[in-house]
Amino acid sequence: MSRKAIGIDLGSTMSEVAVIEGGEPKVMLTTEGSRTFPSVVAIDKKTGERKVGAPAKRQAIMNPKNTINLVKRFMGRKFDDPEVIEAKKHIQYDIVNHNGWAYIQIEGKEYSPQQISSWILAELKKMAEDYTGETITDAVI
């Protein structure tokens, strides 16, 4: 039995996931019927529930401090990096100094940009598994 691998385009604002079908890549549709998936994560301030993608994006106006977008811009960057300083002008959530690195603070907890990105990747993997009906073990990002 062959294993299915997926290809993921993890973007700053939008992401996509594809699988090979009939020798050709097929970009999967989200539950909303879109080929692109918002690279957004939110934590519900009342319930603590994590939302990813379109559900996170939809509640951003009501929950801006706990809605994380553009997280890819902070990956591997120091807190005092000029890119971080500039990006902070365009977001509403808190970026904090965690041992010199740029981390995101949500409801008093600090998360690395990589950890938040992993939540997006996990949702894309789940989307692919739901589509293929198989467990996905390999991915190219």
Q: Which residues are covered by each model-predicted region?
A:
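N-terminal phosphate-binding loop and flanking beta/alpha elements of the actin-like ATPase fold
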Residues: 1-38, 44-141
